[in-house]
Amino acid sequence: EMMEKEEKYNFKRAVFLVDWAYNDGKPSYENFCHEIDSITTTLKAFIRINDAYKYKTAPNWAIFEYFTKSNPMNGNKPFVYDFDDFMGKQDFNKLLVTKILKTHTGQCTSMPLLYKILCDELGGHSKLALAPSHLYIKHIGEDGRWVNVELTNGCFARDEWYMQTFGISTEAIKNGVFLCAFSNKENIAFIMQLLASSYQHKYRNYDYFTLNCSSKALEYAPNFSQALVIKYLNLASFKKSYIQTIGKKKSDYIIRVNKEMHATLNVLDSIGYSQISDEEYQQNVERALKETETMKAKDR
């Protein structure tokens, strides 16, 4: 409904529902909203005390301070990157917002999701954007130009940094695969793929629920890379199950699955999609953190 009807769009609730489904109906939406409201109230007071309401980026500034600096707003506990199981392969909660709210440790999924929820609640402007295996925040600065907020190391990054660090092609940018601000529909498409991934992690299976998550997203965002990847993984799982059960016997079903797999790969290739290994990603984050510490040391 959130993709089909703009009036039903509610990013905060969409993010919550993934958490709620994965954790068997916990926490309650009321408790989740109460925690978000509490943070939002603190951020509003911070903006008011600093007389920053005259700036359109006041919400972005307040949230960045909340995430990255030791201050009373966050209990003198800034948010830091959690390198332990950062892809959520052992515990999918590592990717979810309720975990980061409790621990102030997160990674490139939970940090931007919480940032955007808070920014929406404050009436500010923020967008999600993708790089290979990475999610980050974009918003319009006071000068009308895009600003990239990199919460994993508490800095602002240029597009060129993402291109060099993650090996992003100009083709992928032109096709809206990477470094491009999500629309509301793409926000929900991303959350649907997060839901599909959480389902697969919980039940150790791709099935027609996970396929439906990707198919529904692709109806509204045909080149959305996350959905194309989930679709391909579904089809590959169906093919594997078929071979294990029936063997390599040809049938209309397996011919159709193979055809869809090739078509999906062709789309991913044509739009410039690329990915990096977990090891490469960890090295990128560690390098970025070291660069940040070096810059901070020079400023002292």
Q: What are the residue ranges of the model-derived segments?
A:
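Hydrophobic/aromatic-rich core segments of domains that either
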Residues: 110-175
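Secondary-structure boundary elements
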Residues: 4-98
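Canonical positions in the second alpha-helix
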Residues: 216-217, 268
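Amphipathic alpha-helical repeat scaffolds of TPR domains
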Residues: 181-202, 223-245, 274-295
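Stable alpha-helical elements in mature extracytoplasmic
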Residues: 59-63, 111, 115, 210
